[in-house]
């Protein structure tokens, strides 16, 4: 969720201005104690009202959009945001129609299978333990004991943004994002990177 992306961006020392929906979405996960495997997830959510405010003024280094397609950002608004912002844009969205140009799109295997247009020049596909694929090249994931994949995509998105802003190349940002996601899945529940984690990832 957007709050998890926000929290991980803060862990990397990035100043963040966040706009999100005011409605609470509660996710309850039922996990088997012995195997630590999720058995069931129950979501309780109210209708989410579309965003109708103004974008904040100021100079921003990047625009990060975490969109679970609950209704806060319409498809039209998503395209308008990409056209409006003059700088690097990073999108993680469950929509099936996404901007083709001027943004890095991070999606997983399932989301990729649902895309209406798959020939995207800046598509980054996360493939779980296998890592991430970009322009036909697979960037291998870290070998770790996986306890919980919840929130790993959020961690990846935040780290990808930080890596790009730091190194200036998405090819260098992806390995850092893989390392960050590996830390997240090594813990149970939605995990936010600590300062110690970030120092280890950057070393």
Which residues does each predicted region cover?
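Structural motif
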Residues: 41, 62-66, 90, 106, ...
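A generic structural signal for well-ordered coil/turn residues at beta-strand boundaries
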Residues: 24-25, 36-38, 101, 119, ...
